[in-house]
Amino acid sequence: MLIRGCIFDYGGTLDTAGRHWGRVLWDGYVRHGVPVDEAAFRDAYVFAERRLGSCPIIRPDDTFRTTLDKKLALELGFLSSGERAYISEKDAAKFRKDILDDIYEGVKQTTAESRKVLKAVKARFPMVLVSNFYGNIGTVLGEFWLDGLFDSVIESAAVGVRKPDPAIFRLGVEALGLLPEETVVVGDSYDKDIVPACQAGCRAVWLKGEGWDERQYDESLPDAVITELGQVLNVGWL
């Protein structure tokens, strides 16, 4: 059956070119010389993600820059507190600003490139965004000039369903008004995008980038595997 609509993931797909956010942040720590090892960083990253997911820290009107700043504040606060503090609070404040400016600039560049691809896809098909986010995805899309490209936005914080539950992709299919087999999902996370998209009956294109770990995946599950977002335009049936 022909593809008639597309569902895109946001985080890791449109803003970091397929790289897991943990990798993006860790590289920022390394570039700016934060004196912690990767194991300590991973503990801080997981701590911050859990806090952001369970507490109303992010406001609906928070830009991505503000969101990233709050994330870094949690991570570096974790690393500069307690008996095993790795850095001083003064150093944490400086690292926070420097890493924020660095990574935010990279995200601006990546989303600008993603916008070109999305505009090309939109010329062919209706598009829906399906994202696990903090309740401010609308603000973030506007910040990076991505608003108006999607016919609908399905955000986990708004609908009460999170990936990897296939139900969130079914909501995306319903928003398109199509059948699952007429819909292709494009995402960077094998476990949170590709597997549940296939379980929902959709076609799937995996943006394979630098993951959180070095696991091996069954690349026969997605219908196509790409390493750059722009390659989605060259998938034969898209």
What spans do the regions from the language model cover?
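Asp-based, Mg2+/Mn2+-dependent phosphohydrolase catalytic module
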Residues: 1-4, 39, 82-84, 90, ...
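Switch/coupling loops of ABC transporter nucleotide-binding domains
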Residues: 125
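Short conserved AdoMet
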Residues: 122
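N-terminal helical cap/lid subdomain that shapes the substrate entry/recognition surface
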Residues: 1-115, 138
